[in-house]
Amino acid sequence: AEGCPVSGREAQLGYLLQKGCYTACAWNKAVRRELFSSCDLRFREGVTSEDIDWCARLALAAKSFGLSACRFYRYRQRTGSITRTMNLKSLRDLKENIELCLRLPQEMGASTAIKELYWSYVAYQFGTFLVCAPSVNGPEGRGLVQEMREKRWLLRYNAASRKVQLLYVVDRLLGYRALCLLCRGYAAIRK
């Protein structure tokens, strides 16, 4: 594909993930029209972070990937944007998106090679969940974090993100509870 220095679906997706070029946002992707109908690439309504599962489905459905260094879009972040503020609904939606992403490879018949690459995409979303969750005070937010404990295996897929690498090391050395406490401390400092 044009602009991508490697060829082959797995190599292209791996390259884009490793370089941080394949992120959970729709605005930086040009998609062939036929993929919208053949792969049901519609956004879910009524949820926040709807780009996460949309980009996940695209990663699993596309047969090739390209890359353009040209800037053609200017992003404007709203004051109430999920990337600026986290509330209980946003946290629930993020959790639901991650859980959906975990089911997609099976549902879409992804190869083992693609799944191994794809998990790093999902691991980044899981890392975002862990870092953002402490912003939601109360037992509901803490309960969601505990429900996600069994998904911490995703942190092994950390080669594409320093954030996920750090979370993985803390989890391995100190455990999930300590990881969550450190994320809570980080959230307090960030405010």
Describe every region a protein language model picked out:
Residues 135-191:
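Membrane-interface aromatic/basic loop that binds lipid-linked glycans or pyrophosphate carriers
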Residues 110-120, 168-169, 173:
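Structural motif
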Residues 117-131:
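Amphipathic alpha-helical repeat scaffolds of TPR domains
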Residues 67-68, 116:
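A structural signal for short, well-ordered beta-strand segments and their strand-loop junctions
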Residues 71-79, 84-112, 128, 132-155:
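Catalytic core of nucleotide-sugar-dependent glycosyltransferases
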Residues 52-55, 98-101, 122-126:
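Hydrophobic alpha-helical core bundles mediating ligand binding, dimerization, or RNAP-core interactions
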Residues 1-66, 73-86, 109:
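Donor-binding/catalytic cores of nucleotide-activated saccharide
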